Swiss-Prot record:
Protein name listed in UniProt: Fucoxanthin-chlorophyll a-c binding protein B, chloroplastic
Membrane topology per record: Multi-pass membrane protein
Matching InterPro entries: Chloro_AB-bd_pln, Chloroa_b-bind
Residue ranges of the TM segments: 81-101, 122-142, 183-203
Record-level GO cellular component terms: chloroplast thylakoid membrane; light-harvesting complex; photosystem II
Species assigned in the record: Macrocystis pyrifera (Giant kelp)
Chief localization: plastid
Amino acid sequence: MKSAVMAVACAAAPGFRGPSAFNGAALTTSAKACSAMKMSFESEIGAQAPLGFWDPLGLLADADQERFERLRYVEVKHGRIAMLAIAGHLTQQNTRLPGMLSNSANLSFADMPNGVAALSKIPPAGLAQIFAFIGFLELAVMKNVEGSFPGDFTLGGNPFGASWDAMSEETQASKRAIELNNGRAAQMGILALMVHEELNNKPYVINDLVGASYTFN
């Protein structure tokens, strides 16, 4: 599990990319493509201070609007999942539900470790239920509203739908930008928690920096 977490960390970090061979002509062509790409997408929500338009991996090279919106859809979804993961990580560190997680395995909620270690404790049937539920949400529930912005999963009967529609376009754009930034921070945050858990079983670095003791698993 440790090697898997580290592999994900390395793959996600631009600094771990190996060098590639190129010549002057290729570099010039790449620079022109990047310049055109920046002009196309620099006004999109999320291209904001302090980094502005930032695409170090070149995922949008020669991309059209459809490609951009697909990547934005994926980014928004991953950001939301990461925010839930951060909230769950912190909640489980301090709170355990009463009762049994699995009677057949004689496993209570209080017995479950936090973080990555929990994956090895969940019974196979439990993991199957989790993945089945995720698949159900992905295929049948969380679908983007056709013709709307990437990440608009508004469903019929949503109690917040009316309040969102009542907002001005400027306020909606601001809310979407805030969500993007929070999601980006959460993706880096949950990855950091996973890596530090595997390194020394001390994921909460801020606690260590300020001298606030805690027991993890």
